[in-house]
């Protein structure tokens, strides 16, 4: 494996050997209750709580994040979004399974993680489970614009889901340092990627609002095409894809990071002598 101090991959400088990946899209093969928008970037379950399995249109590149944002929730169901990878070509399936867990996984060559409101973090080897459950601290976004997972470096800014600023929202969070949504909340952002290892296998990682949950599956066949799996299950009704840029952070993004360090709460941005467009960008509107 690459030296941890030498983070490479899609988050590193672009080169002919590692070009920017194409925009992510959902596959035209999906569960019976899924309605896909014309662009292939939004998937909505139109009835029931099942038959909501979706796939990426193309296999993922190593270190490429398939990132979704929860757009709609539906009350009355128990359970949440499920996320993972499969080495099965969606086009080769005789029928899309009703559930990703256990149906798709039981077909083999598929690894799926059920997202819960708590306890999504996977303990590292030798790490107590209680210690793994403690979040690493969302303020890292303000000092480190990249998320580092094994040998890959991924721009963190678009990985983080945030609630829309409200009239009293500044009383409920300490600006963006603590304004990280619960994993299953509306506007929360969740992603999946794989990281190859020297032995020819790969680790699957789940990202929730800019934080790596650790290797939720090991021993994946890195040499085989791996498609993302998104199960729009139960209380999760609709998701949309979020596109990432893997180069250097834009000047606009760096400006936002600096501004966030110097204001007390979100409403304070309104009194700054800045163009309205930049204010809206800083407030994630």
Curated annotation (Swiss-Prot):
Q: Where in the cell is it found?
A: Cytoplasm
Keyword Cytoplasm set for record: yes
PROSITE patterns listed in its UniProt record: NHR, SOCS
The region called Disordered is annotated at 1-28
Taxonomy, superkingdom = Eukaryota
Q: Does the keyword rRNA-binding apply?
A: no
**Pathway(s) this gene product operates in, as recorded in its UniProt entry:** Protein modification; protein ubiquitination
- Output the GO biological process annotations, alphabetical, semicolon-separated: intracellular signal transduction; myofibril assembly; protein ubiquitination; sarcomere organization
Against CDD domains, the record matches this protein to: SPRY_NHR_like
UniProt domain SOCS box: residue ranges: 250-285
Q: List the expressing tissues.
A: Expressed specifically in skeletal and cardiac muscles.
Q: Where are the transmembrane segments?
A: none
Q: Which InterPro entries does the record cross-reference, listed alphabetically?
A: B30.2/SPRY_sf, Neuralized, NHR_dom, SOCS_box, SOCS_box-like_dom_sf
The Gene Ontology CC terms held by the record are: muscle tendon junction; VCB complex
> Which keywords belong to this entry?
Cytoplasm, Ubl conjugation pathway
Annotated NHR domain residues:
23-244
Please report a single Pfam family linked to this protein. Answer: SOCS_box
Query: Anything noted about its domains?
Result: The SOCS domain mediates the interaction with ELOB and ELOC, while the NHR domain may be involved in ubiquitination substrate binding.
The annotated subunit structure for this chain is:
Probable component the ECS(NEURL2) E3 ubiquitin-protein ligase complex consisting of ELOB/Elongin B, ELOC/Elongin C, CUL5, RBX1 and NEURL2. Interacts with CTNNB1.
| PANTHER family tied to this protein | NEURALIZED (PTHR12429), NEURALIZED-LIKE PROTEIN 2 (PTHR12429:SF8)
Q: What job does the chain carry out?
A: Plays an important role in the process of myofiber differentiation and maturation. Probable substrate-recognition component of a SCF-like ECS (Elongin BC-CUL2/5-SOCS-box protein) E3 ubiquitin-protein ligase complex, which mediates the ubiquitination of proteins. Probably contributes to catalysis through recognition and positioning of the substrate and the ubiquitin-conjugating enzyme. During myogenesis, controls the ubiquitination and degradation of the specific pool of CTNNB1/beta-catenin located at the sarcolemma.
Q: What is this protein called?
A: Neuralized-like protein 2
Q: Which organism is it from?
A: Mus musculus
């Amino acid at each position: 494996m690459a030296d941890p101090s030498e983070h490479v991959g899609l988050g590193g400088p672009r080169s002919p050997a590692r070009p920017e990946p194409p925009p992510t899209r959902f596959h035209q093969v999906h569960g019976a209750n899924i309605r896909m928008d014309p662009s292939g970037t939004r998937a909505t379950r139109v009835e029931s709580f099942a038959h909501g399995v979706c796939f990426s249109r193309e296999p993922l590149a190593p270190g490429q994040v398939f990132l979704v944002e929860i757009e709609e929730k539906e009350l009355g169901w128990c359970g949440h979004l499920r996320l993972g990878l499969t080495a099965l070509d969606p086009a080769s399936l005789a029928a899309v399974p009703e559930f990703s867990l256990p149906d798709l996984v039981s077909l083999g060559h598929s690894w799926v993680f059920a997202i819960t409101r708590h306890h999504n973090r996977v303990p590292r080897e030798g790490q107590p489970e209680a210690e793994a459950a403690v979040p690493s601290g969302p303020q890292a976004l303000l000092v480190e614009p990249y998320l580092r997972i094994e040998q890959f470096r991924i721009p963190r800014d678009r990985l983080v889901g945030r609630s829309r600023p409200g009239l009293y929202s500044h009383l409920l969070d300490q600006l963006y340092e603590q304004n990280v949504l619960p994993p299953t909340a509306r506007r929360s952002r969740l992603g999946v990627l794989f990281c190859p290892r020297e032995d020819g296998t790969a680790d699957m990682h789940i990202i929730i609002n800019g934080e790596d949950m650790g290797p939720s599956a090991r021993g994946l066949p890195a040499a085989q095409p791996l498609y993302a799996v998104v199960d729009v299950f139960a209380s999760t009704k609709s998701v949309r894809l979020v596109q990432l840029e893997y180069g250097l952070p834009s000047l606009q993004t760096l400006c936002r990071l600096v501004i966030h360090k110097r204001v007390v709460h979100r409403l304070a941005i309104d009194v700054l002598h800045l163009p309205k467009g930049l204010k809206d960008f800083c407030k994630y509107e």
